[in-house]
Amino acid sequence: MVGELRYREFRVPLGPGLHAYPDELIRQRVGHDGHPEYQIRWLILRRGDEGDGGSGQVDCKAEHILLWMSKDEIYANCHKMLGEDGQVIGPSQESTGEVGALDKSVLEEMETDVKSLIQRALRQLEECVGTIPPAPLLHTVHVLSAYASIEPLTGVFKDPRVLDLLMHMLSSPDYQIRWSAGRMIQALSSHDAGEGQCGEEGKAGEELGRLRDSQDTVAGASDLIRTRTQILLSLSQQEAIEKHLDFDSRCALLALFAQATLSEHPMSFEGIQLPQVPGRVLFSLVKRYLHVTSLLDQLNDSAAEPGAQNTSAPEEWSGERGQLELEFSMAMGTLISELVQAIRWDQASDRPRSSARSPGSIFQPQLADVSPGLPATQAQPSFRRSRHFRPRSEFASGNTYALYVRDTLQPGMRVRMLDEYEEISAGDEGEFRQSNNGVPPVQVLWESTGRTYWVHWHMLEILGFEEDIEDMVEADEYQGAVASRVLGRALPAWRWRPMTELYAVPYVLPEDEDSEECEHLTLAEWWELLFFIKKLDGPDHQEVLQILQENLDGEILDDEILAELAVPIELAQDLLLTLPQRLNDSALRDLINCHVYKKYGPEALAGNPAYPSLLEAQEDVLLEAQAQAKDSEDAAKVEAKEPPSQSPNTPLQRLVEGYGPAGKILLDLEQALSSEGTQENKVKPLLLQLQRQPQPFLALMQSLDTPETNRTLHLTVLRILKQLVDFPEALLLPWHEAVDACMACLRSPNTDREVLQELIFFLHRLTSVSRDYAVVLNQLGARDAISKALEKHLGKLELAQELRDMVFKCEKHAHLYRELITNILGGCIQMVLGQIEDHRRTHRPINIPFFDVFLRYLCQGSSVEVKEDKCWEKVEVSSNPHRASKLTDRNPKTYWESNGSAGSRYITLHMRQGILIRQLTLLVASEDSSYMPARVVVCGGDSTSSLHTELNSVNVMPSASRVILLENLTRFWPIIQIRIKRCQQGGIDTRIRGLETLGPKPTFWPVFREQLCRHTRLFYMVRAQAWSQDMAEDRRSLLHLSSRLNGALRQEQNFADRFLPDNEAAQALGKTCWEALVSPVVQNITSPDEDGISPLGWLLDQYLECQEAVFNPQSRGPAFFSRVRRLTHLLVHVEPCEAPPPVVATPRPKGRNRSHDWSSLATRGLPSSIMRNLTRCRRAVVEKQVNNFLTSSWRDDDFVPRYCEHFNILQNSSSELFGPRAAFLLALQNGCAGALLKLPFLKAAHVSEQFARHIDQQIQGSRIGGAQEMERLAQLQQCLQAVLIFSGLEIATTFEHYYQHYMADRLLGVVSSWLEGAVLEQIGPCFPNRLPQQMLQSLSTSKELQRQFHVYQLQQLDQELLKLEDTEKKIQVGHGASGKEHKSEKEEEAGAAAAVDVAEGEEEEEENEDLYYEGAMPEVSVLVLSRHCWPVASICHTLNPRTCLPSYLRGTLNRYSNFYNKSQSHPALERGSQRRLQWTWLGWAELQFGNQTLHVSTVQMWLLLYLNDLKAVSVESLLALSGLSADMLNQAIGPLTSSRGPLDLHEQKDIPGGVLKIRDGSKEPRSRWDIVRLIPPQTYLQAEGEEGRNLEKRRNLLNCLIVRILKAHGDEGLHIDQLVCLVLEAWQKGPCPPRGLVSSLGKGSACSSTDVLSCILHLLGKGTLRRHDDRPQVLSYAVPVTVMEPHTESLNPGSSGPNPPLTFHTVQIRSRGVPYASCTATQSFSTFR
């Protein structure tokens, strides 16, 4: 039958392709908080199971989870389950109408018939005791079964006599009676809730939980008999029921139980070898299980009705519930104890366990301490490694890692040895030299030996080159400076975590422990101790109670008081020392493994001197108990090794000598069985001792599994065992635990025939007495073993045929037993998960004894995995078997190559018993060409002759290296064959590089992990949605999210610390909890609503707006900020591991949102998605804040300081909320960038100009010195951090333009160049064209030229002096050599020569005129500025030194021109064939005026020097003389005529512009300042002015060119590099750019690729251009765009002419010596510098 899948739209993802759907309401109760809770059944379906139609049909046996939910959780997750009145809709009651279908009178008649039939059947049963049941009895029972199937008659069967009737029928020796009882029970159970819809009539029916699905309780035999489970419970709890049930009756009840639990917990334990459990033990487990479930039902039903707890006094009700909880805990502990013993987990306790849990958060991944191949003794914290290379632990197999090492390793790299190999030890380091195709293939120079040695690829760990290697300790603490370019400095070298004082593991400080509670056991510890006290027999139990009474003031202890007793720790320690001597062997093993014993037992008392004697006795008992198992196994081995002739003792005596003192029981038993007369009185006490301590008995049976030479021992043992079977008490011994030894002896081909015959006799006798052991033998494969023994001995084994037939008849029972142990184990797991859920919901501790033991056994093996060589027994190949080992040598260089015809290429794997392949991979190489496989088929079978099942077929790509053949097999195949059907390029032979086989984890951990994670994920996803609903309705509830999350996560942390045994289990729980709870919550609180605001974004906005109240204790601010910080610290607790594809946030409506989407949570549930959502929300908040600030304050004069302060607040808040994490610093940067990108172009240009001006002011002000200078530098640093946001944005181009102008002004003035360099080093990425860097570089080039010019001047001076000396010498020589008579003639000749020299020197007079200047020679520095990077405005006219400079300055400039023209190569200057200098008015000078030093510009210097010769000069004449514009001249005159200046401007009507005169110092006092700065401030056009509009016009021109070019190329588009080239070419050729625009830009027609790329980014952002998905580097035109065309009338299209001069130069004039001072009263100006 199938049922309709309702509420299919409310699905919760539980894993890949796995979803949970709410199905129906099961029951309700009052929760711990007084509010009603509802148990909802959630169906678990895989993808495709829910059907394709609108309403899927699902099987009622589908997996499900029962989850208690509050009304708010139901509303948030499946609101359709609420009716119109707001109440939860219960299960449908469609069958209630059937009651009215029967007439009342007819119904009464039928009820009378049923009562009479019950009475008649009881009477007939009593009459036929011991005889064959008559036919009327069978007919009566048949009619009763028919009546039982009618639901309206269910009430009649409340009669307690029905239970007596069923009991007698099930106890009847007749099969037909027992069969009829089963039919009647099935008829009664057909009325289970939902059976009519989902059950299958006459078959197994519903699950065990239908008892829990009802509102009734089961208190005794007289309760309602409504379901099969209730009947089983009532029957199984009858005293001495096992005495009344034979094998068939017990199997009938077990079959009913198996049918009842068929769909309760359909867990698959396939691949896990479950032990053989006899029916007697199974029936006991069923009784325990039914008792536990009934108590659990009573606990749930005790609060089913809201008014239930008001029917009696609160204290009485609480006491009743507390007693019920105690009974449930004791029953659950007993069930766990028996289940652990039945599955023999306790016998595996001495096996190596996985490493204990390391302390730490379960929500953060644990880092491996050492490499897998490195022994622990050699692990050193100073090992070095490189962060760039992957360790071996990250790879699934050795072959994969070997391929990675082979492809990555380069000669010269450092490597470390991971394994011991011949002469090289693990941990040795060396340098990789070379590799080849040999074996081993890798040559390494090892430091330990000083020479090279060859090893294998998989043995090496790559460290990298020497410069890449870092210390491991530092690497663990270091976190890379990812955001260094954001802040201009590296992050701290420590890894940030929440402060230990505030956030202890896991997150918050644990609750304060009560000092009084610390002195007593917790309730869970006391109940665990009470469990063992209740296990004691009568006298021992009373003695322990007497001890408790004496230490607790003699209080009378009843069950109610015992449940709530506060036991001091000292008393508990005394009890733990007393109990071991009073418990039996089974209970003692439980005591040793329990939590309270480990915490307060002898190990805890080892340091207490008050217990020395008790500890000694305790240790003796424990050592004896723990050593019995090992001694029993070793005893048989000792017997096998010692020859019989060496000892006169019998074989049995030698066996017990190896066992110890407890072996005396076996000797006494042998003696008692060998004696004549009555043996029962002697044997029975010994059997009771063996029941209490079964280890000697197990050792006796295990001795059969010894070598065949121990024939005498085997015969003796079999004789004893055969005699023991006849005693009823012996059947209570654990025969099933040692039947394996019998099977080993039966299967051994060397077993002696007499021994084999005795073994057959013994097994036949054992199975005849108890058919349970025939079932156990069937499970162990005894039928085949007996058949082989009969074949060997030609059928001459007595009773062997009968034994084989008996074993064969138990095939159905063996299947039933396997099903039962699976169902019981699955049911226990479900109850454990239910207790964990209640623990989560109620926050009450788990008080069940052995709860941690059960979880430890379920989680054991979590770190164990079947390795390759453990999966298969041998590997066979079709040909070349001597090379088969190359398939598994983990060396990718070697291979197996076939040798034969096509179709005969195969590899055969003989798998180990029970191994299910998790992954089978074939390694190939594309370099093998035609030898590489092309098609591979995998077949499976039971033998090599039956490989008929094709498991998979794979087509291999030519480029493949790893071919996965099989994955996650669900069936065991003894033989698996890999057939290479075809090779690449039609090749015949094939080459296989390797074979990888991964097996499953053969433990219960994968099953339990799946169930634990499913329940955890469903619970927390439901809770996350409910919390998200609250926060959507009221954003203020977001402030409580931190406390909610802290409570949930701390509870999971405490649970893992208390109950989970290892890191893998704890990490699985933590990861699931985090993904199910935190990830959805973060997704919901970061998703914007219809107004575009997310709850977390609103909270962060509030945090920023109220920053001023952070430290005001009088306000409510500190508490608010603390909650916000705790929330954000918690949400970023887990670091991102991987980056899945981004999820686009979709707006969601406000208020109570009834529709939600869980569909994407399967991929969003990762830590990295949390970080992505948080950073996205943080970016939106920052963008909103910055955008509001820019909109309101962009015109303000103090815009930049306020912006920097605002940015600093955002930066500090990011550190406060999220710590120095690069992701959130990047979100801050992106948020600011997003706000800047929204600015219109003119506003953006104005903002960039403001930033450039502010930086200029801070740099200029840093010259002040002192504290103000430090303050200025701090403000400058803060501004630079904010400016870094411009990097990569379109605004960077405009910012570079303005910064270039301000920087040029500073560099031409008195500013430190080192500060300029430091600023450029920090904000260099903000200059796409790198023009400021080039300007700074040109300064250094000019300094080098100045140094060379200085040397050049000295050379010229030396040459002039040398000429003068030669001239004087010639004159002197001419006078001395001539006679007096020729004196006049020779004087004329000498004079003529001198005249010639003077004539020749006239050409150089202009250059050398300052050589004979008598005053102080000024120092002149020349800056050669490249027009390529220096901005020179059009108002900066050229300077004519001949007319505007005095002679002593003019000569220096002329000499520099000659020097520059003569120079052949100058680095970093503009390349070109012609280099000419053109002097400009740019620059500055120092003049001496009286006692003042004036800092003036070059124009001002010329004007002041010009006044040295004139008393007054008109402005009009100055304009005519200099050729300057009126604006530039007036700008220079302004400071000179100010109050600090030396000139006065007199306005005259007849003289335009006025007359300049030197200010008379006698009329007004002259300033006493030593240095007066008169350089006029540089004024630039505002962004709103002509320059900003010109920049916008240029951008629009480029946009037009880009759009037109892409339109011409259509949809095919252009590569971005080609597009840039075409745009630059069009810009140069014209008709763009118009000359008017060019001249107004002031930089000529220069247009760089950076300008074009900036425009391309702008158009991409606007959607005008688009990228191709498959080729992102190709751009094409997308949609029409409105581009501002340049106005022709404002651009002067008709203007023409040559480009401006190529290079501009400026002068700096400095002087040497004492300044020249005029002696006259009139002050004059002298050039000082």
From Swiss-Prot:
Boundaries of every DOC domain copy: 845-1024
Domain of life the protein comes from: Eukaryota
One GO MF term attached to the UniProt entry: ubiquitin protein ligase binding
Known pathway: Protein modification; protein ubiquitination
Sites bearing Phosphoserine, chain numbering: 371
Keywords: Cytoplasm, Cytoskeleton, Golgi apparatus, Isopeptide bond, Phosphoprotein, Ubl conjugation, Ubl conjugation pathway
Protein name: Cullin-7
Lineage of the species this protein comes from: Eukaryota, Metazoa, Chordata, Craniata, Vertebrata
